[in-house]
Amino acid sequence: MDNQHKKIKGYRDLSQEEIDMMNRVKELGSQFEKLI
């Protein structure tokens, strides 16, 4: 099922910078979860 997002209209590949930012947000989210 690789690249199935390419079949969905309007979807595009993310840049490495966008992927890095998303991973950072997920990382911060798990840290916030520990604080609560």
From Swiss-Prot:
It comes from the Viruses. Disruption phenotype: No change in virus replication in host (strain Pa011). A naturally occurring inactive form of this protein. Upon mutation by a single nucleotide change (changes the stop codon to Gln) inhibits CBASS immunity; most closely related viruses encode a long version of this protein. The long (mutated) version antagonizes the effector protein of host type II-A CBASS immunity by binding the second messenger 3',3'-cyclic GMP-AMP (cGAMP) and sequestering it (thus preventing host CapV activation) without degrading the cyclic nucleotide. The mutated version also antagonizes the effector protein of P.aeruginosa type I-A and type I-B CBASS systems. Belongs to the Acb2 family. This is Inactive anti-CBASS 2 protein. It comes from Pseudomonas phage PaMx41.
